[in-house]
Amino acid sequence: MLIVLSPAKSLDYKTPIKVKAPTLPEFASESAKLIAELKKLAPQDVAKLMSLSDQLAVLNVGRYRDWSKKFTVDNSKPAIYAFDGDVYDGFDVKSLNTKAIDFAQDHVRILSGLYGVLRPLDLMQAYRLEMGTSLKNIRGKDLYAFWGGRVTDSLKALLGKQKKPVLLNLASEEYFKVLQPKELDCPVIAPIFQDAKDGKYKIISFYAKRARGLMARYVVENRITDPEDLKGFNLDGYKYFAAESKIDKPVFRRAERK
C-alpha cells in the first residue's frame, strides 16, 4: 500500500528535531527549474498569482531568492516535520516511533507543487507553491503541465515493487489531479470522512483534513498493507460505515463533536 498526502501551507522550521538519515528529493533538479521561474516575479506578481497578502508575498519572494540547489540540515528540514497543517496535526509524526517512521518512508508520499513528490524524510527548503497555481513554465501554462507524467511514473515504479499494490488517496483533489490514476495499474482507494452535524452526516473540511492524517498514522503505526484492514480505523471516534461504503470509497463516520 502506498499513501499520497497533500502538503500544508503552514510550515514549522523553528522546532528542532533529530533525524539520523534525512534523504534528498527525487526531483530536486526539476524544482530548480521552477525556482528559476519564481525568481523572475516581484512581490506584487506573487501576491496576484497566489492570492497572498503583501506580507506573505514578500516572505515567499525571499524564500525563492534564498533557495539553494544544495540541501543541508541548515537550510532544509525533513518534509514530514516541516509541514504543519491539519493533516499533519492528525499524523503527529513527533509521537511516532522509529519503526513507524521507517514504514512511512517506504509507504507515504507527499505531493508538492514545487518538489513533485516527497518522501517523509526528504529534506525540503521552505516554499509556497500550491499545485493549482497557474505558473507559466518551460512545459506549459501550469504545474500540471510541468510535472506531466513524472510524478505518476515515480509512484508507479514504487507500487510495482509491492506485493499488493494499492494507492490510498488521502490527498486533496487539487493535488491528486497531478496523477494519471489509470497509468498506475492498481486499485485506488479514496476514503470519505463524515462528521455528524445538526442530525446529518457531512464532510466538514477541517475535520476531514485531520482525519486523512489520522488514517495515514493508523496505517504506518499498524504496518497495514491490505486495504481490508482499513476498516478497523477507529482513531478520534471514527468508525467504518459499511452501508454507505464502496470498495474504492470506504466511508468513516463520527458522532457530533460537543
Swiss-Prot record:
It comes from the Bacteria. One of its GO terms (biological process) is response to hydroperoxide. HAMAP family: UPF0246. Belongs to the UPF0246 family. Pfam families: H2O2_YaaD. This is UPF0246 protein Pnuc_0753. One of its GO terms (cellular component) is cytosol. InterPro entries: YaaA. Signal peptide: none annotated.
